[in-house]
């Protein structure tokens, strides 16, 4: 069975798994349960049923990885981002692994061969999100002091390559203000560490940095080259970039 609805609550996820588990042919075990990204409720179910749980992340951050359930010996957690791997691997060294994202090379070879002569004519093409639709930071109502502090911090980070200073520089006061400004701030129970500073740094400021950097980079490139962007994001801040519709990758 395949679970496609991302909006299922943890309880609904477990109910679906339990129905599949109970409806299997008598005496036929599950080899393993697989998911894209990590779901604590699935890990709990697999641990109780003693079924291997295999997952592979495609996002960063995946805040559910802070759950104490990542420590179970029934988990086989593959993380695509090396910094993500370094952060979480010590919590379960024998069951958390580094595995970059992959693709079906043979399939793409066939796609390229069948589209001969139909390649875009732009000098530079990008496919993907600007993060404008994902950036929760844009909806925060912050004090002038905090807004100025964070603007300066983000400008400093944009000039630094190879290191991330955001989380280490955030003060408790700034973290509290971000948390208070969004009633949907992610604050899970049963975690192995306090997640507030990580969530503020990565789920709010990190997304804002990604949005800012992508828009600035595209605008700078468009001053010198023909640039096309295939996206479904809000592109009003782009200048001289040829905006195309989003593309289907699967």
Role assignments for model-derived ranges:
Residues 1-91, 106-113, 242-250:
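Extended catalytic core of nucleotide-activated donor transferases of GT-like folds
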């Amino acid at each position: 069975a395949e679970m496609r609805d991302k909006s299922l609550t943890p309880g609904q996820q477990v109910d679906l798994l339990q129905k599949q588990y109970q409806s299997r042919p008598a005496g036929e075990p599950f080899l393993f349960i697989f998911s894209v990204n990590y779901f604590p409720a699935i890990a709990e179910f697999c641990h109780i049923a003693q079924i291997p749980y295999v997952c592979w992340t495609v996002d960063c951050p995946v805040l559910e990885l802070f759950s104490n359930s990542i420590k179970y010996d029934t988990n086989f957690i593959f993380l695509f981002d090396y910094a993500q791997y370094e952060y979480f691997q010590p919590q379960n060294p024998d069951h958390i692994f580094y595995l970059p994202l992959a693709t079906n090379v043979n399939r793409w070879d066939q796609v390229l061969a069948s589209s001969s002569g139909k390649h875009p004519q732009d000098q530079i093409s990008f496919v993907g999100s600007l993060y404008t639709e994902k950036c929760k930071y844009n909806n925060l109502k912050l004090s002038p002091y905090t807004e100025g502090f964070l603007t300066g911090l983000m400008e400093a980070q944009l000039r630094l390559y190879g290191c991330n200073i955001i989380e280490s520089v955030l003060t408790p006061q700034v973290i509290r203000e971000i948390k208070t400004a969004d009633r949907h701030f992610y604050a899970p129970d049963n975690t192995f560490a306090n997640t507030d500073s990580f969530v503020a740094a990565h789920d709010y400021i990190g997304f804002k940095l990604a949005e800012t950097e992508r828009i600035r980079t595209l605008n700078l490139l468009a001053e010198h080259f023909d640039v096309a962007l295939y996206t479904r994001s809000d592109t009003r801040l782009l200048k001289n970039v040829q905006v195309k519709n989003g593309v289907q990758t699967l």
